[in-house]
C-alpha cells in the first residue's frame, strides 16, 4: 500500500510517502534469557524471530520504541508468532494500551487470538510509542508438549510519513 500526499506551501512542495518506519531502539519490561535471542529488536527485524518476556506470562509486560525524529504513524501491524505450534504454546497479548509522547493519546485495543497480521490505526505524530500488555491469552498444550510461560510477539511493523 503506497499513498502519496503533496502539500504546497508558499515556497516549497513537500511530498510525503507512506512507508515502513523503523525504530532506532527499543526496550521492554523483560526479555527471555536476558534478551539473548529474544530481545525487542526482533520485533522490527523482518524475520520470524520473536520478542519473549522472561517467563512472566505477559503480566505487566510492555515494549517501547523510539524513532530518530517525530513522524506521523498512520498504523502498525501487530504479528503474533506465525508458527502454529509456537503460537499455540506461548502466551499472547490480548488487551493492549498504546501511548505516545502526546499525553492525550491513549489507544486501547483488543487483539484477536490468532496468528495472522492485525492492523491497528494510530494516526498520531510522535517520536516514541509504547505498548502495554493489559491481559493475555494463555498458551496451550500441543500434542503432549506443555505450554510455554513466555509472552511472545513476532513482529510490529510501523507505517507512516516523516
Description of each model-found segment:
Residues 1-13:
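Extracellular mucin-like PTS domains
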Residues 4-5, 16, 53, 162:
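Positively charged, low-complexity intrinsically disordered regions
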Residues 13-26:
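Extracellular carbohydrate-recognition regions
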Residues 32-106, 114-162:
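Aromatic, loop-rich ligand-recognition surfaces of beta-strand-rich domains
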Amino acid at each position: 500500500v503506497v499513498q502519496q500526499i503533496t502539500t504546497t506551501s508558499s515556497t516549497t512542495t513537500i511530498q510525503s510517502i507512506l512507508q515502513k518506519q523503523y525504530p532506532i531502539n527499543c526496550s521492554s519490561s523483560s526479555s527471555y534469557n536476558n534478551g539473548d535471542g529474544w530481545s525487542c529488536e526482533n520485533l522490527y527485524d523482518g524475520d520470524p524471530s520473536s520478542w519473549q518476556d522472561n517467563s512472566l506470562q505477559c503480566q505487566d509486560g510492555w515494549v517501547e520504541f523510539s524513532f530518530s525524529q517525530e513522524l506521523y504513524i498512520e498504523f502498525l501491524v501487530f504479528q503474533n508468532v506465525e508458527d502454529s505450534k509456537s503460537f499455540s504454546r506461548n502466551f499472547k497479548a490480548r488487551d493492549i494500551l498504546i501511548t505516545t509522547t502526546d499525553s492525550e493519546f491513549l489507544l486501547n485495543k483488543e487483539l484477536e487470538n490468532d496468528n495472522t497480521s492485525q492492523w491497528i490505526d494510530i494516526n498520531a505524530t510522535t517520536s516514541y510509542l509504547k505498548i502495554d500488555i493489559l491481559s493475555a491469552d494463555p498458551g496451550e498444550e500441543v500434542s503432549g508438549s506443555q505450554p510455554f510461560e513466555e509472552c511472545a510477539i513476532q513482529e510490529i511493523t510501523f507505517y507512516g510519513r516523516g
